[in-house]
Swiss-Prot record:
One of its GO terms (molecular function) is 3'-5'-RNA exonuclease activity. Residues 1-47 form a transit peptide. It holds the Pfam family MYG1_exonuc. Its EC number is 3.1.-.-. Belongs to the MYG1 family. Keywords: Acetylation, Hydrolase, Mitochondrion, Nuclease, Nucleus, Phosphoprotein, Transit peptide. InterPro entries: MYG1_exonuclease. This is MYG1 exonuclease. The keyword Transmembrane does not apply. The modification Phosphoserine is found at S120. It comes from Homo sapiens. The modification N6-acetyllysine is found at K267, K273. It is found in: Nucleus, Nucleoplasm; Mitochondrion matrix; Nucleus, Nucleolus.
Length: 376
């Protein structure tokens, strides 16, 4: 009885264990999150951001945080009131301070010039971070490991962390900070369907000011979260596995053609360009790949020119100008290769009914390279 009495007394006197454990922040430095009072432990965490017109960066920052288990049920507090912001567990895109130790992630203050490169030495990206980039920098590895069902030490997490920043988050950082894609000159056409543009259109219009901004912000978070998860799924299940196919194609390139400048992909629909550029630099002997051949969904063969850069529309060596825009028999006659299907008007891709025919188109182009007008 005495022991039971003492255990009961200790249970009453000692504080209860916390209802949940907050994670340690990831990024350039690991710091403990601010401690919450016992009363706050009973309530969901609070994510603070500014009210009024919203933008893609804070919508993405809040959405990424809510994908983490510890913030899944977090309340979004949209305000500029310093007292209300002070009561929040984490604040993004407002408040005028960047202090990871206190979980304050604003980028608008004059003193803020941080980039992924400056905060994570070794990373190449030098675009000024927005609140989206800051949250991704500090929580991204943990988030991806959680979503991918693996550990942060898994090399896949590091690969996809870089891929998602370069091809998703950095764009949001740049747009929010007003950084143009072009160093000089005017763009030839408008980009109006970007993620940032679609988020902006969820704000109330000038002639309907009574629209619910809070509902619009929730739709914005849902939009950016869905796109983030879709992109991650594509990179995990399509882009990353394609690397092995490109590696195999490069290893077999001399069996395809003695020049080593033509590769054949086992599955043509795979995303090969970035992998080829990365792997090509390590080839021995060094060689530039000019053409990729593969079968399409109809079982016919395609010959695709390797672009000068992964996202470029300009080819290293386009198909001959006299072939461009022609089809079928007209193309057969001009090329001297029976069985042709088409050559695109820009010369970046063509089709043939057989593998040997596609190879003949590539070899004929290589043979004429010194006489071809190349796109500069």
């Amino acid at each position: 009885m005495g022991h039971r009495f003492l255990r009961g007394l200790l249970t009453l006197l000692l504080p209860p264990p916390p209802l949940y454990t907050r994670h340690r922040m990831l990024g350039p430095e690991s710091v403990p999150p601010p401690k919450r009072s016992r009363s706050k432990l009973m309530a969901p965490p609070r994510i603070g951001t500014h009210n009024g017109t919203f933008h893609c960066d804070e919508a993405l920052a809040c959405a990424l945080l809510r994908l983490l288990p510890e913030y899944r049920d977090a309340e979004i507090v949209r305000t500029r009131d310093p007292e209300k912001l002070a009561s929040c567990d984490i604040v993004v895109d407002v408040g005028g301070e960047y202090d990871p130790r206190r979980h304050r992630y604003d980028h608008h203050q004059r003193s803020f010039t941080e980039t992924m490169s400056s905060l994570s030495p070794g990373k190449p990206w030098q675009t000024k971070l927005s609140s989206a980039g800051l949250i991704y920098l500090h929580f991204g590895h943990k988030l991806l490991a959680q979503l991918l069902g693996t550990s942060e030490e898994d090399s896949m997490v590091g690969t996809l962390y870089d891929k998602m920043y370069e091809n998703f988050v950095e764009e949001v950082d740049a747009v929010d900070n007003g950084i143009s894609q072009w160093a000089e000159g005017e763009p030839r056409y408008a980009l109006t369907t970007t993620l940032s543009a679609r988020v902006a259109r969820l704000n109330p219009t000038w002639n309907h000011p009574d629209q619910d901004t809070e509902a619009g912000f929730k739709r914005a978070m849902d939009l950016v979260q869905e796109e983030f998860l879709q992109r991650l799924d594509f990179y995990q299940h399509s882009w990353l596995p394609a690397r092995a196919l490109v590696e195999e194609a490069l290893a077999q390139r001399f069996q395809v053609d003695p020049s080593g400048e033509i590769v054949e992909l086992a599955k043509g629909a795979c995303p090969w360009k970035e992998h080829l550029y990365h792997l090509e630099s390590g080839l021995s002997p060094p060689v530039a790949i000019f053409f990729v051949i593969y079968t399409d969904q109809a079982g016919q063969w395609r010959i695709q020119c390797v672009p000068k850069e992964p996202h470029s529309f300009q080819s290293r060596l386009p198909l001959p100008e006299p072939w461009r825009g022609l089809r079928d028999e007209a193309l057969d006659q001009v090329s001297g290769i029976p069985g042709c299907i088409f050559v695109h008007a820009s010369g970046f891709i063509g089709g043939h009914r057989t593998r040997e025919g596609a190879l003949s188109m590539a070899r004929a182009t290589l043979a004429q390279r010194s006489y071809l007008p190349q796109i500069s």
